[in-house]
Amino acid sequence: MIEADRLIQPQIQAQDESIDRAMRPKMLDEYTGQDDTRAQLKVFIQAAKNRNEALDHMLIYGPPGLGKTTLAMIVANEMGVNIKSTSGPVLEKAGDLAALLTNLESGDVLFIDEIHRLSPVVEEILYPAMEDYQLDIMIGEGPAARSIKLDLPPFTLVGATTRAGALTSPLRARFGIPLRLEFYNIKDLSTIVTRSAQVMELDIDAEGAFEIARRSRGTPRIANRLLRRVRDYAQVKHDGAVTKFVAEHALDLLDVDSEGFDYMDRKLLLAIIDKFMGGPVGLDNLAAAIGEERETIEDVLEPFLIQQGFIQRTPRGRIATARAYQHFELIKPE
């Protein structure tokens, strides 16, 4: 299994939570990047406020670490309502969801992270709640059991997932606002790094922020994590200020290279190049070659490598691109 503490892992780590919370923007105007999504949300939120209605149900999907939870909180702040947060695996029984729904006030946001992992029995309860703001509850057991309907206040369900394709069709169809988050460009990440440094009261120049941003794999969570580690290096080895020189040396020490790759990324790419002559190679063979599960490759390692043009998916398997060979200063065979 892949190590849970990879520095450039986009999934949240225990030490991220409290620090990320302090760095999160609170309103849309403070939110950097995702321009199309931000523009859409401004329209939808203003329209709902003008009509004095709850915002339509929203599905936010995309790779981990891009700000799905942050966006859900911003939606609640912009609407001026409360937010209750949970996750799909936590809602094991219908009663778990019913307890949350019955405590919502009019217009509130219910945020369910990893919504693709909801159990079928919980999902069934969610359908009438989303469509009709009604909760169907079974009272009693056996032959004496009967169903009663409870009216719920209008609310907004915000679901977040890294695997939109894993949602059932009936659930996916009930979201009126689907929003896909993309990897961030370096310019926007530099802005995020600079803002986070200000929150941390850390002296950083534009080149230092850029160097951290370009090694952050298009992911704000990784950028903030790298910033904290570069800060440590700057305070111990230098005068505490983060320059390009300091950032380069700190990240080289941390084994995060110029493309934001760590040893696992290099291991995957070199396996395709060396063991399978550049590909194509099937996912199962590749997983066996590097000692990882196929889901880890698909969900954790591959997305960024494909998006950046280092791996190509074909019907016959994965292929290392010319850019992958260039990264390792190798010549791609004809």
From Swiss-Prot:
It is an enzyme of class 3 (hydrolase). Keywords: ATP-binding, Cytoplasm, DNA damage, DNA recombination, DNA repair, DNA-binding, Hydrolase, Nucleotide-binding. Its main location: cytoplasm. Coiled coil: none annotated. Residues 258-334 are annotated as: Head domain (RuvB-H). The keyword Amino-acid biosynthesis does not apply. The keyword DNA damage applies. Mg(2+) binds at residue 69. This is Holliday junction branch migration complex subunit RuvB.
